[in-house]
Amino acid sequence: MRVGFWRLRKVMQKLNINPTVTLNARVCETYPSVVKACIDSGWELNAHSYDQVPMHKLDDERAVIDKSMDIIEKFSGKRPRGWFGPGLTQTFDTLDYLSEAGVEYIGDWVLDDEPVTIETRHKPVVALPYNFEIHDIVMMALQNHPSDEWHGRALDHFDVLYAESAERPKFMAIACHPYLSGVPHRISHVERTFAEILSHDGVVAWDGSKILDWYLTEGRMRDAA
């Protein structure tokens, strides 16, 4: 966090990428300078619970969701629109609690390459495309691949989606964590990967809110037609 975040930030700024920052609310208390840098950069903050305790192990899941949303809103001035559960964990009640707390989209359901509307007892929530394979924890910490796997796997994944996008829009999520993607021996692979993807015609880098807004105004209408 103290070093890797700033390396990633330089890459994002160099390539004009405004990512979604999936934020444990506790970071607002422990590393406020990092959260402020995200806000100053114009990056979206979404909630990642208070800390990394799995949702099914919380004594009061609803209270932790509300606490997390409130802390980030108080610090940033904006209530998060999105939510990622720690380790993508949920219970059967999570979506209902999230909808009640004002969450509009989640990234916990790795089920499609396009947004999907999910009904809850409150208001619908949109599941945005997430990927647990183009993900630095999986590639580097769990599967123990060399650093260049970052570039090769991401481009292989992108090439298929790019070809399919000739028929309908596709979305590709890439997960970066400062302590993995922000280290010296990986950061060049991260930068090269994003640069090559963005060099293709018709490709844009959007945060979660932009994807959500597109889906709510155009995507669902396209599917209904």
Model-derived features: positions:
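Catalytic alpha-helical scaffold of carbohydrate-active enzymes acting on polysaccharides/glycoconjugates
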Residues: 1-126, 151-174, 180-225
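A structural motif
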Residues: 120-138
